[in-house]
Design a protein with these regions (language model features):
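A cross-family phosphate/adenosyl-ligand binding-site feature
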Residues: 40-41, 45-48, 56-123, 127-128
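Short glycine-rich anion-binding loops that position phosphate/pyrophosphate groups of nucleotides
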Residues: 51, 79, 112-113, 137-140, ...
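Short, Asp-centered acidic motifs that coordinate Mg2+ and/or phosphate
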Residues: 131
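Glycine/threonine-rich flexible loop motifs
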Residues: 140-149
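Hydrophobic/aromatic ligand-binding patch that stacks against planar heteroaromatic rings
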Residues: 154-158
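Electrostatically charged, flexible surface regions
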Residues: 179-291
């Protein structure tokens, strides 16, 4: 970084190396005015995922968020899809520093996405994150898929720690997909949460359809759905491979995430850590008087 006093400008450049050296993103931060020699502390943003530290999605997400604050990436050292909120309880977890640059650190973790968040808060960051962001996941986490999601497992862990948290996912399995069409929406949502925070015990599950241009954004609820035919025999006798067929149980419900994705819109679903079914509690009051 350098200070150009004649033009009263502070400029800082950070390089983000994408997986396998495919491309480099350079972001410059400029501060103008009479106090240009002084830069206020930028918000700290914790970044995680469940596809692993080398996934394209987390590299793209990091570049999108860099203009908004200092970034601490702590992500699994390999794919952890379907990890949900699981954590490592039977063996030690290894944390490795991969990169340290102005405004950016990157660590890999041998554990789950939940482990990554726990370790980051206790052994990586030196101040409390203003925001935690997970993704961008290769594959949507809409409808019931949110319950299996390691992407959202990391988000829920941060939310339980009182940190505003967002999960971003893309409806695709293409490991080399283009995340550019979603950049503006990611930064707009992240900026809004940084400024206004979120209600207590509430986080956001954001999903994108794979389109060249979004048709809009819909704040909605998760659709009811189910999986069937989930296991098929593998080559070795007695072993099985996860597969499955998803069915949306309310495909015509326009207030759901699945409908929004089917119609080219981003879906934003507020999730909460309190899983109490308060609407059903009264119907079960009879249990209190059972003999």
């Amino acid at each position: 970084s350098f200070v150009d006093n004649s033009r009263s400008r502070l400029s800082r450049e950070v390089k983000i190396f994408f997986p396998h050296g495919r491309r480099i993103a350079r972001i410059s931060y400029l501060c103008r005015g009479k106090n240009a020699g002084y830069m206020a502390e930028r918000p700290l943003i914790l970044v995680c995922n469940d596809d692993g530290i080398d996934a394209q999605g987390i590299a793209a997400l990091t570049s999108m968020l860099l203009p908004l604050g200092d970034i601490a990436v702590v992500a699994p050292d390999g794919p952890r899809s379907g990890a949900a909120c699981s954590m490592t309880v039977t063996s030690p977890v290894r944390l490795r520093l991969l990169e340290r640059a102005p405004g950016l650190t990157r660590h890999s973790c041998s554990g789950t996405p939940t482990d990554c968040v726990k370790l980051a808060l206790e052994h990586v960051v030196e101040r409390r994150p203003a925001l935690m962001v997970s993704g961008i996941n290769h594959g949507d986490n809409a409808s019931v898929n949110v319950h299996y999601s390691g992407t959202m497992g990391a988000v829920l862990e941060a939310c339980m720690k009182g940190i505003p948290a967002i999960g971003f996912s893309l409806r695709t399995r293409d490991s080399q997909c283009d995340f550019t069409p979603y950049s503006d929406t990611v930064t707009r949502i992240a900026s809004h949460v940084l400024e206004h925070r979120l209600p207590q015990d509430t986080c956001l599950n954001v999903n994108f359809p794979q389109v060249e241009r979004l048709r809009g954004l819909r704040v909605c609820r998760m659709a009811r759905g189910k999986w069937s035919s989930e296991w098929e025999p593998a080559e070795e006798p007695g072993t099985f491979r996860l597969t499955g067929h998803y069915t949306c149980l309310e495909p015509g419900a326009e207030d759901t995430d699945w409908w929004a994705l089917d119609h080219g819109m981003a879906s934003v679903v507020p999730q909460q850590t309190d899983m109490t079914s308060t609407r059903r509690a009264d119907a079960l009051k009879a249990l209190e008087t059972m003999p």
